[in-house]
Amino acid sequence: MKCSIKLLFTFVLPFQILFGWGNTGHRIVGKVAETYLTKNAKVLIKKLMGHHDLSRMSNWADHIKSDPNWKHANDWHWCTIPDGEDYEKGKHKGLAAEKVKEFITVLKKRKSTKEEKQVALKFLIHLIGDLHQPLHVGNGEDRGGNSIRLKWFGESSNLHSIWDSKLIEYQNLSYSEY
């Protein structure tokens, strides 16, 4: 599992810069990550997750946002770092960076249950993507681009929405075509 985590960070992060981060963007990231997994990492993930592949589980963390039992996780998808400051645990709003570290620890621990590891892997795949969406890591002054109103082909929108999904939707390709 340690090797899988290293590979995920090594190969997913550079590709994140190329894509948006709506459903399709997250699935693209999961699919790209899968192509770089070792055989052993694939076996470990299949043993842990069953038939689910990384691309299909990459959006789970967004899909559970409407579940009241997961409301506490809403601030895990972003972090705010004011201009001129460095990230410091617990100092600023948003917990994405802290949660990535926490989920890596869960995956490494032998004492973690299978269910804890499944949740950790699903969040880890998703949050790595979120942290590399520029509007999920910002100074907080524009609410992650949500306060910046724009027109997208004549339709009212905001910078966050355009960056998150509309840029990819405009290409009209499935995640497997990237």
Describe every region a protein language model picked out.
Residues 1-24:
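Bacterial Sec-dependent N-terminal signal peptides
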Residues 19-127, 134-178:
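N-terminal, motif-rich segments that launch catalysis or mediate targeting to/interaction with membranes
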